[in-house]
Amino acid sequence: MAARMLGLCGRRLLAVAATRGLPAARVRWESSSSRAVIAPSTLAGKRPSEPTLRWQEDPEPEDENLYEKNPDSHGYDKDPAVDIWNMRVVFFFGFSIVLVLGSTFVAYLPDYRMQEWARREAERLVKYREAHGLPIMESNCFDPSKIQLPEDED
């Protein structure tokens, strides 16, 4: 059913193309499900004439190949001197300034989340406790004598 409808539509398109003088290509379809072959019928035994091609020159060429004029083009400008200058400026700022100054900036950023400060403070506290004969760590974070608990009301 589908193959028959497809063949009918194909024949109609070829007939319309032939009556209007449009170039029509011979088309042949093969259905994968029903293994039917659909080919257009010959239209009154006439073979359509080959289309004539007319050369039309583009008045404004948009796509110029810069490599014909300058084989070492970097794509920044049509003029070779400006192209090389722009390439050098881009690479100078891209590598020298961004990489060198950027890495220096990252190296001198302040202490992230104060990790270095916390380590120095812990080392200072350990030295103080060892010098005064105190244990390095206590089980109580707060002095138990200073904590006031509510009274038991049974």
Swiss-Prot record:
Localization in the cell: Mitochondrion inner membrane
Membrane-spanning intervals of the chain: 89-109
Principal location: mitochondrion
First and last residues of the transit peptide: 1-29
Membrane-topology annotation of the record: Single-pass membrane protein
Superkingdom, natural source: Eukaryota
Region: Disordered, residue numbers: 40-77
Keyword terms, alphabetized: Electron transport, Membrane, Mitochondrion, Mitochondrion inner membrane, Respiratory chain, Transit peptide, Transmembrane, Transmembrane helix, Transport
Residue stretches of biased makeup (Basic and acidic residues): 66-77
Gene Ontology CC: one annotated term: respiratory chain complex I
Family named by the database record: Belongs to the complex I NDUFB11 subunit family.
Function: Accessory subunit of the mitochondrial membrane respiratory chain NADH dehydrogenase (Complex I), that is believed not to be involved in catalysis. Complex I functions in the transfer of electrons from NADH to the respiratory chain. The immediate electron acceptor for the enzyme is believed to be ubiquinone.
Quaternary structure and interacting proteins, as annotated: Complex I is composed of 45 different subunits. Interacts with BCAP31.
Protein name: NADH dehydrogenase [ubiquinone] 1 beta subcomplex subunit 11, mitochondrial
Species for this entry: Bos taurus
